[in-house]
Amino acid sequence: MPRSKNDKNIISLYALLIGATIMNFLPSIAIQTFGGIIFFVTFIATYILRAKHDVETDHYAHCSYIIKTIWIFSLLFTVGLIISIGAADHSAIINIVDAIQTGAIPTEQQMMDAVLQFGKDNLILFLILFLPMVIYLFYRFAKGLNIILKSKPAIALKGWL
């Protein structure tokens, strides 16, 4: 059965969000920034697309599901970020800040080394706080994408999972 334009739009939203999320884990600030922009623009596009559908349609349900997923993820991410600010070992960053305050100008390599050391020092904390959120995000996107690809009714998109 050929897919409608609306189905293709929803599939594109899921694909863009999954792709943007993956891009945010690649080791390049430029790619991560581009991924963040794609994620944000797709989020806005989801609101716009949802406004074009009646509340009773599957397409409206998919858009609402995507929006709810992103808002729940954002809330969990913010809580995790607040916890990590208080619980993280900031010694690598503090050393660079102290050097700057004494008049030293750290090289780009020294700055990068401090950021990498900060990541190494806090890897377990970051995994505990953020990995469940990322798994939740991918699970929800994969579930929604699977439902539309199999042409199932969007009634299965209710709830937190």
Listing of model-derived features with the role each one plays in the protein:
Residues P2-L161:
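Alpha-helical membrane insertion/targeting regions
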